[in-house]
């Protein structure tokens, strides 16, 4: 497994554990109210599982799978840039929600996440080839 894929998968597993833990706390809070502020974990739970775990795992596996047939990976900088962009975006969105930061900070987090997706697409696009070229 390439080093970048390993970093993506490890980070995805950390987000999975965090998201699962927050989800468990939210579920337990429904049965036995723990604290009124427990519900403030819901946006972080969603962010960690949807973007932190799912997208990051998909990026890690996609980077590992592509390219096919022993071709070169091309310029690695956009792919390596995806990792900090996505993680910074996830944490900025989560912290903006928890700490009641201004709305622009949450928008900035989403922009970082979108930039991460664009960087990964920029890297992966030339590596996706049809099975049989005409």
Task: Place the predicted regions along the sequence by residue.
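Hydrophobic alpha-helical transmembrane segments of multi-pass integral membrane proteins
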Residues: 1-134
């Amino acid at each position: 497994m390439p080093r970048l894929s390993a970093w993506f998968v490890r980070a995805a597993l950390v987000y999975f554990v965090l998201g699962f833990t927050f989800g468990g706390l939210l579920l337990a809070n429904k049965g036995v109210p723990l604290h009124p502020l427990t519900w403030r974990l819901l946006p972080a739970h969603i962010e960690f599982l949807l973007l932190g775990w799912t997208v990051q795992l998909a990026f890690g596996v996609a980077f590992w799978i592509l390219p096919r047939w022993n071709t070169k990976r091309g310029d690695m900088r956009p792919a390596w840039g995806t990792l900090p962009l996505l993680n910074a975006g996830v944490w900025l969105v989560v912290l903006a929600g928890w700490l009641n930061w201004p709305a622009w900070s949450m928008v900035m987090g989403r922009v970082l996440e979108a930039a991460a997706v664009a960087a990964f697409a920029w890297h992966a696009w030339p590596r996706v080839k049809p099975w049989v070229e005409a």
